Amino acid sequence: MDFFVAGSWRNRDAVAEVVDALEGAGAQCYSFVRAQYDDEALAFAVPGGADAARLGEPGIRSLFEQDLAALRSADRFVLVLPAGAAAHIETGIAYGLDKSCYAVGPADRSETLYRLFEAMCTDPADLVRHLAVADARRVR
């Protein structure tokens, strides 16, 4: 899989736009907005669905394991801003796994750790353009 796309449930429309742009450019993506979850996890895979859940619940464990497996198998990582704590934790995991990391969307404030991103793109089209240029440079 090419990309793991992370973001906030509150920003899921923007996440879907990034997934659409990447898939339109021929990439394969994993994202919570399109993931197929099993029955245990499905109840939690909705806006606010996991907010009051206990971490030990089987559905929460299933969600975590599926998302982590997808993150490990992805070649690159995209964070769609603004995003919450969970998506930022996923960013740290991706960086720790030595994935190329990109951000898309408005950065509400300057964060020094955002330097881990190879690029901070303004919108999905900007991300696709940046990736095309970066990929062309790697081929040379």
PLM regions with names:
Residues 1-140:
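Conserved catalytic or regulatory cores that recognize and/or transform ribose-phosphate-containing ligands
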